[in-house]
Curated annotation (Swiss-Prot):
Subunit and interaction comment: Tetramer of two alpha and two beta subunits.
SMART domains assigned: B3_4, B5, FDX-ACB
Boundaries of every tRNA-binding domain copy: 39-148
GO cellular component, one term: phenylalanine-tRNA ligase complex
Gene of this entry: pheT
Sorted UniProt keywords: Aminoacyl-tRNA synthetase, ATP-binding, Cytoplasm, Ligase, Magnesium, Metal-binding, Nucleotide-binding, Protein biosynthesis, RNA-binding, tRNA-binding
Localisation: Cytoplasm
GO BP of this protein: phenylalanyl-tRNA aminoacylation
GO MF annotation terms: ATP binding; magnesium ion binding; phenylalanine-tRNA ligase activity; tRNA binding
Protein name (record): Phenylalanine--tRNA ligase beta subunit
Residues reported in the UniProt entry to bind Mg(2+): D454, D460, E463, E464
B5 domain: residues covered: 401-476
Amino acid sequence: MKFSELWLREWVNPAIDSDALANQITMAGLEVDGVEPVAGSFHGVVVGEVVECAQHPNADKLRVTKVNVGGDRLLDIVCGAPNCRQGLRVAVATIGAVLPGDFKIKAAKLRGEPSEGMLCSFSELGISDDHSGIIELPADAPIGTDIREYLKLDDNTIEISVTPNRADCLGIIGVARDVAVLNQLPLVEPEIVPVGATIDDTLPITVEAPEACPRYLGRVVKGINVKAPTPLWMKEKLRRCGIRSIDAVVDVTNYVLLELGQPMHAFDKDRIEGGIVVRMAKEGETLVLLDGTEAKLNADTLVIADHNKALAMGGIFGGEHSGVNDETQNVLLECAFFSPLSITGRARRHGLHTDASHRYERGVDPALQHKAMERATRLLIDICGGEAGPVIDITNEATLPKRATITLRRSKLDRLIGHHIADEQVTDILRRLGCEVTEGKDEWQAVAPSWRFDMEIEEDLVEEVARVYGYNNIPDEPVQASLIMGTHREADLSLKRVKTLLNDKGYQEVITYSFVDPKVQQMIHPGVEALLLPSPISVEMSAMRLSLWTGLLATVVYNQNRQQNRVRIFESGLRFVPDTQAPLGIRQDLMLAGVICGNRYEEHWNLAKETVDFYDLKGDLESVLDLTGKLNEVEFRAEANPALHPGQSAAIYLKGERIGFVGVVHPELERKLDLNGRTLVFELEWNKLADRVVPQAREISRFPANRRDIAVVVAENVPAADILSECKKVGVNQVVGVNLFDVYRGKGVAEGYKSLAISLILQDTSRTLEEEEIAATVAKCVEALKERFQASLRD
């Protein structure tokens, strides 16, 4: 935002120079991007009056004038400007004047006629780029007055970056409030006297979208002269704020916009049919904008319409069919509060970014509309004449923003600032900021001013107090903090340790999105309800994941499509499972999952190309589980999972509780996901593994170990893991090792049965076992297997 320093000083005039003022504004949070003089460096230019103006005898495009500059005689000056005429008050550079660019004015002859000065344009004085003619001053401009003094050109344009939370500073009044607070000065607001209605003319106004437009004010002004010139003082203020003068009506609404931060619009009343209706656009409805372009509107766009057509995009841009033109005599002034959410994004959708939409998107003071309407009415009547009707106010109090009531605690204030500010000073700062303050014991109750949308929570008040108090006034103090040593249990298994193990085994860690494609997720978890996002980034990212497999398998496909056929990846992260018993109805579990596919080894001349299988992944998984010290308590059980191959998968159980799955991706799912070749996955509930068994030191036996091998025939559906577990249980005191070293099916073994060759390692820590003891233990194991599994020794 750009504004004139002198305009700001009309509201509040601290006794500091321009540099100090700019620095103060920056430190208040409104970063100053630049300070530039409003005019070039010149002197010797005064107000003059063209007393005579005649055609140059030797040049068609030149005129010979006599100009009164308040001296003893009239000056002869040759001028080429087309708007030079008798009686005009002008800016005259007299002999000896120096204009921008070190251009010195001297007496000269132009085509034989003497010239004792120069009638200046705005561009020649470095005020603007306008070189279409000489400056036309008001008829009451005092002759002989220095033009710098008359036009107040010893001024600067200050440009600031206004952050989105400080929409109140998109008007002079907002910046002035901050400067007044920082310098403990009163705010001198211009006197705005309500304009009484002198006519009864009104237009019916209906608001059909109160959520988008909680307040709408309209006022008819009849009999205006739209061709009346905008006063030079107003043109100059607009120019110094970067706004080009258009006509008196538009200039008035722009002036109020810059002064108060309230956008306004003027409709040609005679082109409105019936009355005003504030509604949402009809899908596909069109509107020809003021710049001549046609906009196709969506149903979520707010429009100002009459009883037959849309007239304007509410809070964004006016329409051509209701705009003010040279023939306009009667206008309807609009001043409204539009909800920021109803404006946000609508302008960009049509390639627009207007001063009005910029302010409405960030928030306009909902208590400002009556003041702005009265200000605009007075300025319009003073410049263009006319008579005003009554103000029609349609307000829906239920949808207007409510002023936040915030409690500021002394303890919170001191802790966040790190410095004690006296109670009286805190109260004074909050009141000067516009808050209604009630003091309590070690706290303040503050009602935020209507123009501060960013004051919502306690931290906002802490920030405001620190900002106004002055960050430079807060002394530097060394941080005093007690160091609390984190507790570390030896039984805690670090997830980082597991990640390192997987890295060592050739896996790479990936991070995928927590929100996934619900269609793909349903393929992996059919029939399981997932949490759907109300405002997703896209349809493909609209559901919270039920497992890490969805993202991991998508990553595999992505890599395979880029000629990466050997993939080993893992991920740790949360899954989100709907659960009515959990807080907020969602259970978040930390999971560890991985995927492998492709060749078992990297390509090598001495290694055969072998594709990974179930046992490759199971072996890697057992290495992970071994870190917990509970591998002997882990069971792999055949259990159905719709995402996995029914004959090459298993559920993982720890002490009878399921903690995950491992297996080959189901062939049908592989086809649907476009996976290239056999793909294997695993997933574990990490929280059920993080508590590891601390290794216990035990005596190493000095006595020899004995191995005995047995081959038992069992039914095909008996898991080998159950056989090994039973052997360990029976020989708990002497059997120190059990291993499956062969599985046989075929000749000598009946159909539907298998032969398991098992090695038993027997050892005692106190003595050498006798053969009879060994035989008895082996027999005991065989007997237990017969009893539980109907196993028989193979002949």
